[in-house]
C-alpha cells in the first residue's frame, strides 16, 4: 500500500467563539495563509508570527493547531505532542487536531495511538461532511474525466500494461484499512502485487488503483487545481505499481 501523505487536509470546522463573524473569519484566513507560507520557508518566523497574535484570539483552535505545527517543525514531534494532546482534549470534535496528533504519534513510533486518532479522524470527517451536506458524488464526473485523460496520455509501454489494472472510485478509505494504519485522508491507494511480484503464489487479489472522491475535493476546491492533482496523484500510483525510478517518473510528467 502506498498512501499519499504530501498534503495537509482542510475541512471546515464551525467552532463557537466570540470572534465568529465574517470579518474575523477573513482575518483568520489571511493569517493562516501567511503562517503556512512562512512555515514552509522560515519556521522560526512562523513561530514568531503565531506567538504574536492577540491574546483574545490565541485560544481559537486554528491558532492553537498552527502553534502546535510551528512547535513540531522547530522543536520536534515530542515537543508538539503535549500541545496537541491538550488541544484534542479541549476540542474533541476537531478532526484536524486528531490528524496532526496521529502524525506526531507516527513519528514517535506510537502506532496504536496513531491508529486510534486516525479512526477518530475518519469518523469526524464523515460526520462533518454529512452535517455540511457535502456530496462527493458531485465530483465523480470530473475525477473520472481527469483519470481517463491521465491514462490516455501515458507513454508506451505503460498505457498497454495498465489495461488490466482497474482504477476505482471510493468515497474515502474503509475503516478496515484505517485500522491497519492507512491514512484516512489519503488521496489514493495502490493495492495488490507489483509487476515484479505478479508471479508470486501469495497473490490473493488483483492490483487496483483507488481514488478517494471525498478526500480529493476537500483538498483542492478549485476545479482546475483538482483536475491537475487527480492526474498527478494517479501518476504517482502508477509509479508505485511499476516501482519506477525518478528518471522514469520524469517521463510520465512527474518532475
Regions found by a protein language model. Name each.
Residues 27-132:
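Alpha-helical protein-protein interaction scaffolds
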Residues 189-231, 241-255:
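Active-site scaffold of zinc-dependent metalloenzymes
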Residues 100, 106-193:
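A metal-dependent hydrolase signature that marks the N-terminal structural subdomain at the beginning
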Residues 22-25, 40, 74, 137, ...:
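Charge-dense, low-complexity intrinsically disordered segments
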Residues 157, 237-241:
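Short alpha-helical functional segments enriched in proximate histidine and acidic residues
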Residues 234:
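Active-site beta-strand/loop microenvironment that shapes enzyme catalytic pockets
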Residues 1-22:
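Histidine-centered metal-binding segments
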